[in-house]
Amino acid sequence: VVEVTGAPGGVKAKGAVLVDAATGQVLWARDAGTERPMASVTKVMTALLVLQAGDLGRQIRVPEAAFSYAWEHGGESAALRPGDVLTAQQLLAALLVPSGADAAYTLANAYGPGLDAFLARMNATAARMGMRHTHFTSPDGLPYPTETSTYSTPSDLVTLGLAAMRYPAFRALVDLRFYDLPKGPGHHQYWWDNTDELIGSYPGAVGIKTGYTDDAGHCLLFEATRNGQTLIGVVLGSPATGPAAGVQDAEKMLNWGFRLPRAG
């Protein structure tokens, strides 16, 4: 058990929570039960459904609609080429590392099958996991049909993050600074940089997922381990003080959390 005193200073996020991953002890929270849009942090649920399906070697063709979908909604893109055939694991990399909305569409379309069926599964899974203040209207967190139609809470997103991080294949991807996929039979070469600036810059950081829209602000689901202690947390609605606003909030929370004394 961690002995909690005070609070992290200078955190600007509208909603936040920091949790000891091993015990579930909440170390600090700000409006952790308030529903807010979480942008691309949504993609963690998309990944979880693919992981639960189990066959990461499944071959999936990138549909023509994936490109137009990402372009139409202004989403981050993994620059997937329609017609390319990639494995589910490679598409998870395209989803989680560069935060590709085209990858989200491709996976949702394959695993629904179809977008509507996949969204129904996302919401059913959230309900089954006890994420009572979470709702999905897209597999990627893009702001449609409205800016706030896909929403969650910091507490619910910790539940989601803990579930996803139980999968070694997920952990391995969200901890990468980049992903290099050489040209192969059926697909072009791809190079994807991780959108999470915590990776490689914060000692002990192991993920998890960034998000940003105008309405959601900067969002980050994060986890770090130091001296055998793992902390997981969320920031939602960090103001746009720069591209790494969510990272700055996360670093302040983690620095504070790791300094707390542990009882016994």
Show which residues each predicted segment covers.
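Active-site-adjacent loops and short helices of periplasmic peptidoglycan-processing enzymes
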Residues: V1-S155, M165-P168
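Penicillin-recognizing serine hydrolase domain
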Residues: V1-G15, G83, P113-G264
